From Swiss-Prot:
Oligomer status and interactors: Part of the 30S ribosomal subunit. Forms a loose heterodimer with protein S19. Forms two bridges to the 50S subunit in the 70S ribosome.
Region called Disordered, residue ranges: 92-125
Keyword tRNA-binding: yes
Pfam family, one: Ribosomal_S13
Entry function: Located at the top of the head of the 30S subunit, it contacts several helices of the 16S rRNA. In the 70S ribosome it contacts the 23S rRNA (bridge B1a) and protein L5 of the 50S subunit (bridge B1b), connecting the 2 subunits; these bridges are implicated in subunit movement. Contacts the tRNAs in the A and P-sites.
Keyword tRNA-binding found: yes
One BP annotation, GO: translation
Protein name: Small ribosomal subunit protein uS13
Length: 125
């Protein structure tokens, strides 16, 4: 079954399969299935056409998913950078934006280590 441009795995439960769509997490998936009247433990391959249509309608009308959600997130980050707030500056410098330490760690955000010349550890005498 295709939903919002994503192939959902047919052998998984509906609540798990819906989380393959960007912008839909576990809680959203449960809410969508509850509104559509579908049991969360029902597999995607077992869904009737009416149930699949109901899920598509709910997602189309009430949720921002995939490319639209990604674009919204990028615009939000760009707005922070444009107004020059602290979080925006941290994004601009590719540093953690939520108060994590950066003296050590923060490698995911900072990237590969850059060696600085002239810094050697002093040996024991």
């Amino acid at each position: 079954m295709r939903l919002a441009g994503v192939n959902l795995p047919l052998n998984k439960h509906a609540v798990i399969a819906l989380t393959y769509v960007y912008g839909i997490g576990n809680t959203s998936a449960k809410n969508i299935l509850a509104k559509a009247g579908v049991a969360p433990d029902k597999k995607i391959s077992e869904l009737s056409d009416e149930e699949a249509h109901a899920i598509r309608e709910i997602i189309g009308n009430e949720y921002t998913v995939e490319g639209e959600a990604r674009a919204e997130q990028q615009l939000s980050i760009k707005r922070l950078m444009d107004i020059g707030c602290y979080r925006g500056l941290r994004h601009r410098r590719s540093l953690p934006a939520r108060g994590q330490r950066t003296r050590t760690n923060a490698r995911t955000r900072k990237g590969k280590r850059k060696t600085v010349a002239g810094k050697k550890k002093a040996g024991k005498k």
